[in-house]
């Protein structure tokens, strides 16, 4: 069982245009979720990946006299082969031993790193992004994503001469082996999070693996628990990951659920660290609804530490109201599952997640896990003998929420965007305590994201577009 420490991170939610920028000042390579970019273009080049592999092995070797062990997993992108080889070469060049899992979910790498007592785990994936992109995420020996300080040290090493002075030769050069049982280990891990007293015998389930990392393990997990599984998105070709399928396109799962009369649809993203569900009526159940459903069940059974969950500033106000009505509490963080996990560990909380479908059950896993999350929802359905539609609709009443994105060539600091700030301030005064606004730059894409909540959908939609128009004027003015 993963360990989580206790401190108290209860801190105020960020203001509309003042969300904390979690990326450390001066960092060039690492973003909010590792390194990400267009494959074979800076920074996501094999040259960078090789040096990154060397730096990972160097940092992991601190204080150890034995050979460093590193697990490397990937999703199904064509560029995964290129980057996998480069990172593995870098680790071997520093004397490390590489264990290659092949295509496997991000949470599987975290679990394997911990269970196999490796010194680090590396995931090659750009999550929900198209196949042309790729990324690299790093886990520590405890299965948690590396803290900012460790990433900063790795980046510093990559720019220094220390790595060149630490070369090994002869018999000290490392090696790489394939983990033939990696998928089987992870399937067993997932199944063990489902209560042994329950069964999925005969339950009709539709699973969409987005032609991604879970294309083999996801159908296996649910089938081995007895379910009647219809599998979508299980024919990766290196170029179709996330393409009109998976968590970003639950309409395909919806159609199949209605066609087959399934009890639930489970849509994963490319690396299976997040999930969006569809109930038996074809209604989408997002991360907020899943959190409400699971948190209220944990509250009723006394299994929610401090009656508190952790989520981000993007989660719907309805989630907060649902928890508050049952004497529960919500701690909000900046956007990014790593910051949710950070707050959970610091506060001794066990459950949290994001509206986008990253769901973290620290009693089971160290990071967001779409398959594990789906199993917990299925367990509640079995225990309460109720359909997902009933459970989800009763869990929370959603406040109308609008999300708008705009792509910009220039990324200005939010506090310098005067028209945007004035517009947001005016709308916030109009909304009062009946709504919220959040404006932020994406941590992984060149997009400005605007979220507005309020009682009337058409009104808040107009507000969101008004904010984006103000942002366009700010950027145009700065470029003139």
Swiss-Prot record:
<dbReference type="InterPro" id="IPR005844">
    <property type="entry name" value="A-D-PHexomutase_a/b/a-I"/>
</dbReference>
<dbReference type="Pfam" id="PF02878">
    <property type="entry name" value="PGM_PMM_I"/>
</dbReference>
<dbReference type="GO" id="GO:0008966">
    <property type="term" value="F:phosphoglucosamine mutase activity"/>
</dbReference>
<dbReference type="Pfam" id="PF02880">
    <property type="entry name" value="PGM_PMM_III"/>
</dbReference>
<dbReference type="InterPro" id="IPR005841">
    <property type="entry name" value="Alpha-D-phosphohexomutase_SF"/>
</dbReference>
<dbReference type="GO" id="GO:0005829">
    <property type="term" value="C:cytosol"/>
</dbReference>
<keyword id="KW-0413">Isomerase</keyword>
<dbReference type="Pfam" id="PF00408">
    <property type="entry name" value="PGM_PMM_IV"/>
</dbReference>
<feature type="region of interest" description="Disordered">
    <location>
        <begin position="1"/>
        <end position="41"/>
    </location>
</feature>
<dbReference type="Pfam" id="PF02879">
    <property type="entry name" value="PGM_PMM_II"/>
</dbReference>
<dbReference type="InterPro" id="IPR005843">
    <property type="entry name" value="A-D-PHexomutase_C"/>
</dbReference>
<dbReference type="InterPro" id="IPR016055">
    <property type="entry name" value="A-D-PHexomutase_a/b/a-I/II/III"/>
</dbReference>
<dbReference type="InterPro" id="IPR050060">
    <property type="entry name" value="Phosphoglucosamine_mutase"/>
</dbReference>
<dbReference type="InterPro" id="IPR036900">
    <property type="entry name" value="A-D-PHexomutase_C_sf"/>
</dbReference>
<dbReference type="GO" id="GO:0006048">
    <property type="term" value="P:UDP-N-acetylglucosamine biosynthetic process"/>
</dbReference>
<dbReference type="GO" id="GO:0004615">
    <property type="term" value="F:phosphomannomutase activity"/>
</dbReference>
<dbReference type="GO" id="GO:0009252">
    <property type="term" value="P:peptidoglycan biosynthetic process"/>
</dbReference>
<dbReference type="GO" id="GO:0000287">
    <property type="term" value="F:magnesium ion binding"/>
</dbReference>
<feature type="active site" description="Phosphoserine intermediate">
    <location>
        <position position="127"/>
    </location>
</feature>
<feature type="binding site">
    <location>
        <position position="273"/>
    </location>
    <ligand>
        <name>Mg(2+)</name>
    </ligand>
</feature>
<feature type="binding site">
    <location>
        <position position="269"/>
    </location>
    <ligand>
        <name>Mg(2+)</name>
    </ligand>
</feature>
<dbReference type="GO" id="GO:0005975">
    <property type="term" value="P:carbohydrate metabolic process"/>
</dbReference>
<dbReference type="InterPro" id="IPR005846">
    <property type="entry name" value="A-D-PHexomutase_a/b/a-III"/>
</dbReference>
<feature type="binding site">
    <location>
        <position position="271"/>
    </location>
    <ligand>
        <name>Mg(2+)</name>
    </ligand>
</feature>
<keyword id="KW-0460">Magnesium</keyword>
<keyword id="KW-0479">Metal-binding</keyword>
<comment type="function">
    <text>Catalyzes the conversion of glucosamine-6-phosphate to glucosamine-1-phosphate.</text>
</comment>
<dbReference type="InterPro" id="IPR016066">
    <property type="entry name" value="A-D-PHexomutase_CS"/>
</dbReference>
<keyword id="KW-0597">Phosphoprotein</keyword>
<comment type="similarity">
    <text>Belongs to the phosphohexose mutase family.</text>
</comment>
<feature type="modified residue" description="Phosphoserine">
    <location>
        <position position="127"/>
    </location>
</feature>
<protein>
    <recommendedName>
        <fullName>Phosphoglucosamine mutase</fullName>
        <ecNumber>5.4.2.10</ecNumber>
    </recommendedName>
</protein>
<dbReference type="InterPro" id="IPR005845">
    <property type="entry name" value="A-D-PHexomutase_a/b/a-II"/>
</dbReference>
<dbReference type="InterPro" id="IPR006352">
    <property type="entry name" value="GlmM_bact"/>
</dbReference>
<feature type="binding site" description="via phosphate group">
    <location>
        <position position="127"/>
    </location>
    <ligand>
        <name>Mg(2+)</name>
    </ligand>
</feature>
